[in-house]
Amino acid sequence: TNGFAPTQNLKKQLSTMLTSVGGTLIGKNVVIGPLTNIDKGTIYNTNISNNVYIDSMVMIGHNCKVEKNTVITTGVVLCGSSKIMSNCWIGANSTIKEHVTVKKNNLIGISSVVLKSTRINGVYAGNPARYIKNNLKI
């Protein structure tokens, strides 16, 4: 019978359809640790702003934006099109869901899973991440 299976031609067509037109922009004074992956943008660029520290084994998906003075620690996953605003600290092994914004001056606790956009100046932790308290100063 003729079941559904990818063929060489279908693979080529899909590859052509999914070609990325975006790139990756990395600012000044950025540190990127070993075994870190930063995907280029699909339509828009993936942007890493100035003065950002990205530790080892971090995965940054397509179209993500990381603003200035941010620390992303070991094992963090930023799913596609997520945004980390300025002056944030993302705890080890945390995950930020796609299309979610971590607003400025936020601290995300270790192994947290952020499923919804945060408010400014917050401390969040847990799975799913919940607002803990106001973070007046990082």
What do these predicted regions represent?
Residues 136-138:
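Long, low-complexity, intrinsically disordered extramembrane tails
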